[in-house]
Amino acid sequence: MSRRVQMKRVVVAVIATSLFLSPSAFAEANGKSVKSAKIPAIKCATTKAVGHTPPSVAPAEKVLRRIPRTFTFATNCGNIVVTTVGAKAPITITQLATLARGGYFNDSLCHRLTTKGLYVLQCGDPTATGGGGPNFTYRDENLPAEGLYNYPAGTVAMANSGPGVNGAGTNGSQFFLVFADTTLGANYTIWGTITQGLDIVKAIAKAGVKGGGVDGTPNQPISIKRVTVSNS
């Protein structure tokens, strides 16, 4: 099947439900404490980012001829660089690059931190509600095998709200950064690996969740100021 035909399967829809699965759906994979781990200190600038309505960005109609190699997320806590999986997830990377180049992620908060059962920082929702996304969705790609720690530390994967109608997918803009080896159902497209800045994500995790829980808004606010997409 050609890439052009695959891209025509992009579904126009607004995701109205909270993305990703509850940590209660998973047993804790290991007994490691994020707070007890030795993590380098980081310095975060104050962010003025708040939940907001993002700009409208139209979906790409076909896969990019050159799949971007890196996404650099400039945050108030430093740069997080993600090296993509390239041709293993061409639709996902193309749509994320389209959103990034359209300013969709600019000044958006990473709205959710989970520190028990699964170990992720979730970003990509400018509304900061967990239910935001662009006006289109697309199918899953590059799903891992089922098994222990199938989303290892450094993995970057898409959040979603299920497989969608006839497997059309519910991927949009939200993604999660894995800061410690995590076991999940093999339902989330892996599109990259953190090659710079994992220490930033770990430090955010070490600072914990507001209210002292294990799933919610990070104590230390972290916002994406802008995203630079590169082919080199």
Feature annotation, model-predicted:
Residues 2-4, 8-9, 20-232:
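Cyclophilin-like peptidyl-prolyl cis-trans isomerases
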